[in-house]
């Protein structure tokens, strides 16, 4: 499996630990930087990772910044990306199994390299479990990423809200 990874200057050491971990497990790692502690901007690296995954150059992306919030927002702007900011196993597995996440985001200063590696290992062994319901949700997410008239439609999520009201839809 080819894995794209990127970070900002705040978490270069944590990213390198994750890269070493992935290589030790036999994964091909595409490191999009940054490679040092010189101040830089996380959107650059989120975009690079997202483009690698969206183009098929990588099968999974990992984005890391100090809190994870900034780089995860950046990577999610790349069409075709479904990234989840996670800090625990439950969120990571849900992201993969239910939403077929193709990028995972971390706050390296919050989660730390050891927990990141544990979460990544679990994620790599998890598989998307398609269902009619999550296929529809993923389609709605994909629909939102492109500008279209339906985005301003106040009933865009009506189908899901009605199911919720009837007790048919559960988190």
UniProtKB/Swiss-Prot annotation:
Its EC number is 5.3.1.26. The keyword Isomerase applies. Pfam families: LacAB_rpiB (PF02502). SUPFAM superfamilies: Ribose/Galactose isomerase RpiB/AlsB. GO terms for molecular function: galactose-6-phosphate isomerase activity; ribose-5-phosphate isomerase activity. The keyword ATP-binding does not apply. GO terms for biological process: D-allose catabolic process; galactose catabolic process; lactose catabolic process via tagatose-6-phosphate; pentose-phosphate shunt, non-oxidative branch. PANTHER family: DNA DAMAGE-REPAIR_TOLERATION PROTEIN DRT102, RIBOSE-5-PHOSPHATE ISOMERASE B. This is Galactose-6-phosphate isomerase subunit LacB 1. It comes from Streptococcus agalactiae serotype III (strain NEM316).
């Amino acid at each position: 499996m080819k894995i794209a990874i990127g970070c900002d200057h705040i978490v270069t050491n944590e990213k390198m630990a994750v890269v070493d971990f992935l290589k030790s497990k036999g994964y091909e790692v595409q490191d999009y930087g940054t490679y040092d502690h010189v101040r830089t901007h996380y959107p650059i690296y989120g975009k690079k990772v997202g483009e690698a995954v969206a183009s098929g150059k990588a099968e999974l992306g990992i984005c890391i910044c100090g809190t994870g919030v900034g780089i995860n927002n950046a990577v999610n702007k790349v069409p075709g990306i479904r990234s989840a900011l996670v800090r625990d196993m439950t969120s990571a597995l849900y992201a993969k199994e239910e939403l077929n996440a193709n990028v995972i985001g971390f706050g390296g200063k919050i989660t730390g390299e050891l927990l990141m590696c544990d979460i990544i290992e679990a994620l790599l062994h998890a598989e998307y479990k398609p269902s009619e319901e999550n296929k529809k949700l993923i389609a709605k997410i994909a629909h939102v990423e492109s500008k279209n008239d339906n985005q301003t439609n106040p009933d865009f999520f009506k189908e899901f809200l009605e199911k919720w009201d009837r007790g048919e839809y559960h988190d």
